[in-house]
Amino acid sequence: MQLFVRAQELHTFEVTGQETVAQIKAHVASLEGIAPEDQVVLLAGAPLEDEATLGQCGVEALTTLEVAGRMLGGKVHGSLARAGKVRGQTPKVAKQEKKKKKTGRAKRRMQYNRRFVNVVPTFGKKKGPNANS
């Protein structure tokens, strides 16, 4: 039966169905130079085991096998590993309601009381409203 193998290029193999996936990998390695241990053979998106024969895997005539390179995995280094860390750790706190600011006559009354009525006479130079002392 005929079998299509899509690696870097599309290849056509003539097989009997008794070949193992490892034999297909070796054939692709000789054609394209990709080491067999770096290949992943996929049938309809599912990886195939090296020891399994094509008949056991459900490969029929005119089926396309895909050969993908093995991706190196592991930890992410650098700033990508910390992305979103602070926001994820910060607890959500409900916003507090603020008092409405006074306007007009009430605001002027509050300013008058602060400046002239509640004043405690002190000695020395007069300090401004933002002085830290």
From Swiss-Prot:
Residues with the N6-succinyllysine modification: K125
Gene Ontology terms: cellular component: cytoplasm; cytosol; cytosolic ribosome; cytosolic small ribosomal subunit; extracellular space; nucleoplasm; nucleus; small ribosomal subunit
Positions with biased composition (Basic residues): 97-110
Annotated keywords: Cytoplasm, Nucleus, Ribonucleoprotein, Ribosomal protein
InterPro entries linked: FUBI (IPR039415), Ribosomal_eS30 (IPR006846), Ubiquitin-like_dom (IPR000626), Ubiquitin-like_domsf (IPR029071), Ubiquitin_CS (IPR019954), Ubiquitin_dom (IPR019956)
One biological process term in Gene Ontology: defense response to Gram-positive bacterium
PTM field: FUBI is cleaved from ribosomal protein S30 by the deubiquitinase USP36 before the assembly of ribosomal protein S30 into pre-40S ribosomal particles. FUBI removal from ribosomal protein S30 is a crucial event for the final maturation of pre-40S particles.
Protein name: Ubiquitin-like FUBI-ribosomal protein eS30 fusion protein
Entry's family note: In the N-terminal section; belongs to the ubiquitin family. In the C-terminal section; belongs to the eukaryotic ribosomal protein eS30 family.
Region Disordered, residue ranges: 84-110
Ubiquitin-like domain boundaries: 1-74
Other comments on record: FAU encodes a fusion protein consisting of the ubiquitin-like protein FUBI at the N terminus and ribosomal protein S30 at the C terminus.
Pfam families associated with the record: Ribosomal_S30 (PF04758), ubiquitin (PF00240)
Organism whose genome encodes this protein: Homo sapiens
Transmembrane segments: none
Effect on the protein of changing G73A: Abolishes FUBI-ribosomal protein S30 processing. Impairs 40S ribosome biogenesis
GO terms assigned for molecular function: protein tag activity; RNA binding; structural constituent of ribosome; ubiquitin protein ligase binding
